[in-house]
Design a protein with these regions (language model features):
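N-terminal Rossmann-like NAD(P)+-binding subdomain of aldehyde/semialdehyde dehydrogenases
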Residues: 60, 66-180
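Rossmann-like NAD(P) dinucleotide-binding subdomain of oxidoreductase/dehydrogenase enzymes
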Residues: 169-308, 432
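Residues at or immediately preceding the N-termini of alpha-helices
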Residues: 82-85, 104, 122, 306, ...
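Conserved C-terminal structural/oligomerization subdomain of aldehyde/semialdehyde dehydrogenase
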Residues: 77-80, 262, 353, 385, ...
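Mature-region segments of soluble proteins
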Residues: 2-72
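Residue-level signal for inorganic ion chemistry
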Residues: 107, 152, 213, 244, ...
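ALDH superfamily catalytic-core signature
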Residues: 76, 238, 272-412, 441
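Short, well-ordered beta-strand elements within core beta-sheets of diverse protein domains
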Residues: 77, 94-101, 191, 298-300, ...
Length: 461
């Protein structure tokens, strides 16, 4: 921060030049220092490189504010040019040879240190997440921190077991031979993450690729880049700067990264962007893993526990303000209990507190960006125009990112809120009279991501 930068500047001003060189040399080699001495020099190394070369060791630039590096808003001219991307990729490929030769156990040691770093810095990380996304503190803690730590603990406990060489049966035609399954790194993996879970969707795929022996090119969303956060925890854990490189920027930067022929692309985001990535990757037959959009149905039968179902609908639709690919977006309720369920749901969402908090007092955060807010507004206006009743949230001004839960009754199939992904705090209610009709409504979608059935009859569910 600014105070730390001033302190370093004063220190360097009063120290003799030879001693300054010694300090900078120690900072550059912080990973080789004893455990008690390494952290402050890692911080210094990261800070110096952050100021001089942007926030992670390559000429990655974007026309957005920088808060953490120098304590004031500034701009970096332009986005990453092709030569910078090529140079950074060359360094990733060069570093991969050394990473590949490490044992899984050695890589897991870095995972353990990373988990410890995140635990130590969790309050600061949550602050950065809230500033970037507008999440409630509870959402930031449970979905971003808890989930990430859980994943890292899994890698610590299970990576060696899952990645060790395994003997498998040999077919009779190869009698006399031995067969084994051996897991080999892919090389450099490109991770492109979404704006809705910027920390979790960074650390989880980065570490999954790393523990398998891959270097990682990571591009966060331009909406929630979390400038310097990922770099800080990785450096704190002792990650070599050549193992993971962060590239800031918009879609053009992602396209340049794909052109570098990564070993694999892991993308989470919209269906439209996923199609573009797959089309570009197909030119080189680059393997892709895509996690895209959804219009996830929740089917509630008459024999369901209504209190639990109502709580489940509110949680499923409003966690992360509905900005999740697996959010409940179609609530399909059996006709005989529809009115009771609807009234309970309106009462449930009406007691929830909306806002960005610092003490865990808010139940729902605000929308992350104006782009997605405008989509929710368009869905609301379309539903009202076509006859839907807004039972909660009708007073929203259609502009503020503080969007209240929007409960719809009278939803029909021609409405956007029925067909398109809203990715916001929407709760469209739809009646059904038979099991067959419920299944048909649930499957009446171009998406196929997640769904839930609420009933005491496990056979039917």
């Amino acid at each position: 921060d600014r105070a730390g930068l001033k302190g370093v500047a004063v220190l360097f001003a009063i120290l003799p030049r030879p001693l300054v060189k010694v300090v900078l040399s120690l900072a550059a080699n912080a990973n080789r220092l004893p455990g008690w001495l390494a952290p402050p020099f890692r911080e210094l190394n990261l800070g110096v490189k952050g100021v001089v070369m942007s926030l992670y060791y390559s000429d990655v630039t974007m026309d957005r504010k920088i808060h953490g590096a120098v304590g004031f808003d500034t701009k970096i001219a332009g986005e990453t040019d092709g030569s910078s991307v090529e140079e950074a990729y060359a360094k990733l490929r060069a570093a991969q040879a050394g990473l590949r030769s490490m044992t899984v156990r050695d890589r897991v040691a870095f995972i353990r240190r990373l988990r410890e770093s995140i635990l130590a810095r969790q309050e600061w990380i949550i602050d950065q997440i809230q500033e970037a996304t507008g999440k409630s503190r509870t959402d930031a803690l449970t979905s971003e921190i808890f989930g990430t730590l859980d994943h890292l603990l899994f890698l610590e406990k299970s990576a060696e077991k899952h990645l060790r060489e395994k003997k498998v049966p040999t077919p009779p035609v190869l009698m006399g031979k031995k067969s084994v399954v051996r897991y080999e790194p892919l090389g450099t993996v490109l991770v492109i993450s979404p704006w809705n879970y910027p920390f979790y969707q960074a650390i989880v795929p980065i570490t999954s690729a790393f523990v398998c022996g891959n270097t990682v090119a990571y591009k966060p969303s331009e909406y929630t880049p979390l400038l310097g956060v990922v770099e800080t925890v990785l450096a704190d854990a002792g990650f070599n700067e050549g193992w993971v490189r962060v590239f800031y920027g918009a879609g053009e930067v992602g396209s340049k990264l794909i052109d570098q022929k990564p070993g694999k692309i892991f993308f989470t985001g919209s269906t439209a962007t996923g199609k573009k990535i797959m089309a570009q990757a197909s030119r080189e037959l680059t393997p892709v893993e895509l996690e895209l959009g959804g219009k996830d149905p929740m089917v509630v039968f008459a024999d369901a526990n209504l209190d639990r179902a109502v709580a489940g609908a509110a949680w499923g639709a409003l966690t992360n303000t509905g900005q999740s690919c697996t959010s409940v977006e179609k609530i399909i309720v059996e006709d005989s209990i529809f009115d009771d369920f609807r009234d309970r749901l309106v009462k449930e969402v009406g007691r929830l507190k909306l806002g960005v908090d610092k003490d865990g007092g808010a139940d729902i955060g605000i929308m992350t960006n104006d782009m997605q807010t405008s989509i929710v507004a368009a869905h609301l206006e379309d539903a009202e125009k076509k006859g839907a009743k807004v039972l909660h949230g009708a007073g929203w001004d259609r502009k503020s990112r503080a969007v209240p839960p929007l409960v719809f009754d009278g939803v029909t199939r021609d409405m956007k809120v029925y067909r398109e992904e809203s990715f916001g705090p929407v709760l469209p209610l739809i009646r059904f009279k038979s099991e067959e009709e419920a299944i048909e409504i649930a499957n009446d979608s171009e998406y196929g991501l997640s769904a839930s059935v609420w009933s005491k009859d496990l056979v039917r569910a």
